[in-house]
From Swiss-Prot:
The keyword Nucleotide-binding applies. PANTHER family: DCTP DEAMINASE (PTHR42680:SF3). Homotrimer. The active site is at E137 (proton donor/acceptor). DCTP binds at K111, S112, T113, Y114, A115, R116, T135, L136, E137, Q156, Y170, Q180. This is dCTP deaminase. Belongs to the dCTP deaminase family. It holds the Pfam family DCD. GO terms for molecular function: dCTP deaminase activity; nucleotide binding. Pathway: Pyrimidine metabolism; dUMP biosynthesis; dUMP from dCTP (dUTP route): step 1/2.
């Protein structure tokens, strides 16, 4: 299994629609202002956060149960920024829609710009033949409110191509998050 380069990422995005919309270079400014970078990097793709957020709330004093998740545990926000309360959590989604090839697995890591501020981005791997918008998980590990910027970079996707095609892909087994649109809550 080998990590794929910027040339491969550009070719796959342009020829197969692996990433849409796609930025072939690295964007570091918008309207003359510095931003958290996004787009193609040497061996990965820096994804952007859309303007749809779900922020945890404790209004109902609900127990968080991944097998029986209460949607009322979140407050929905549509904004160019998201303020995550201290020691709290938010969900978002990517601007980019992904179509992962059958012989590829991705790993997604948070950007150091956020990590150095105590904001951890968690995303599980994109499995072979998974497609959809990526649901992003942001944890604010600090005792202070933390800000996330929509339309800017938040994590980097690394692409690994296998030496052998898998027998059963995510699509083959009817993965529960296949084709997701919007911020998707836990499913069992």
């Amino acid at each position: 299994m080998t990590i794929k380069s910027d040339k491969w990422i550009r070719r796959m995005a342009e020829q197969t629609g692996m990433i849409e919309p796609f930025e072939p270079g690295q964007v570091r400014q918008s309207n003359g202002q510095k931003i958290v970078s996004y787009g193609t990097s040497s061996y990965g793709y820096d994804i952007r956060c859309a303007d749809e957020f779900k922020i945890f709330t404790n209004i109902n004093s609900t127990i968080v149960d991944p097998k029986n998740f209460d949607e009322n545990s979140f407050v929905d926000i549509k904004s160019d920024v998201c303020i995550i309360p201290p020691n709290s959590f938010a969900l978002a989604r990517t601007i980019e829609y992904f179509r992962i090839p059958r012989n590829v697995l991705t790993i997604c890591l948070g950007k150091s710009t956020y990590a150095r501020c105590g904001i951890i981005v968690n995303v599980t791997p994109f499995e072979p033949e998974w497609e959809g918008y990526v649901t992003l998980e942001f944890s604010n590990t600090t005792p202070l409110p933390a800000k996330i910027y929509a339309g800017e970079g938040c994590a980097q996707v690394l692409f690994f191509e296998s030496d052998e095609v898998c027998e059963t892909s995510y699509k083959d087994r009817g993965g529960k998050y296949q084709g997701q649109h919007g911020v998707t809550l836990p499913k069992t």
